[in-house]
């Protein structure tokens, strides 16, 4: 429209908006200024340092997250902690066990309510992704974990012989699924977690030879990508009791990326939440360190990290008080306040009915 005035342009835009809303329904297009900006709803990861590194206090709802790393690095442990946190808020969780390796006894130790956990062990990749789509479209499931992308074997590969070549079959399967998930996830407010494995690219001379399975589509569609690694062993005398773990947020669409979180994963117990909170409190000088002694409000709580952690375990009130100070220092909401807000949104009976 050559030479059109600002008034003419505004009128044309209004006509276009009216036509779009008439054809596709109200809400299909809108001005951002007409909608109140709301905080991104999240589910905690169970590790306070990782919630802080993510920038918004956890994994955002209505989006996809990829957790990848080497074998036995804590990928499934982290995902199960997120499931447990979702269930604490009254949410419904589903676990699509493509690897057929879910340890329910271990999941229960991490705080997962296995009686209310929806579990599926699909026979092939297409079935797993279709189950995930049906659960997302139901609108009643708060979190879905797919363990793992590498185990989402296409049906054609399962039906074929061992030596058959299927170039790019899994990548095409994932690409199609990502296109379908992207729209429905946002409307259902479901957190979708994909656990992935690492492979080595052959012939790489420069840069990292590591890559993840399933093609590039998952990397593009995920709002968060978490790289989890073991960086050391935790010992009690000569016995190894756990791993020191580092998580790097390599992609983040809702906050600045490349933040790093470190915490302990104890064998048989999962993430050491008190140890994680203790390290953050020491870093903020909420807990003072003098030599090998730690003090809170000018009173000694223990000599050495382990003794101080034990003191906090034995005194939940002080532990909670310190945690709230840490959360406040990083701008995260009070845990009890978050729980009240989440449980007030949708009644449990209504969610169960939808599923």
Swiss-Prot record:
Hydrolase recorded as keyword: no
Keywords in alphabetical order: ATP-binding, Cytoplasm, DNA damage, DNA recombination, DNA repair, DNA-binding, Nucleotide-binding, SOS response
Chief site of localization: cytoplasm
Entry-linked InterPro entries: AAA+_ATPase, DNA_recomb/repair_RecA, P-loop_NTPase, RecA-like_C, RecA-like_N, RecA_ATP-bd, RecA_C_sf, RecA_monomer-monomer_interface
GO MF assignments: ATP binding; ATP hydrolysis activity; ATP-dependent DNA damage sensor activity; damaged DNA binding; single-stranded DNA binding
GO cellular component, one term: cytosol
Location within or outside the cell: Cytoplasm
Highest taxon above the source species: Bacteria
PANTHER family in the cross-refs: MITOCHONDRIAL DNA REPAIR PROTEIN RECA HOMOLOG-RELATED, RECA
Entry function: Can catalyze the hydrolysis of ATP in the presence of single-stranded DNA, the ATP-dependent uptake of single-stranded DNA by duplex DNA, and the ATP-dependent hybridization of homologous single-stranded DNAs. It interacts with LexA causing its activation and leading to its autocatalytic cleavage.
The name this protein goes by in its record: Protein RecA
The organism of origin for this protein: Desulfotalea psychrophila (strain LSv54 / DSM 12343)
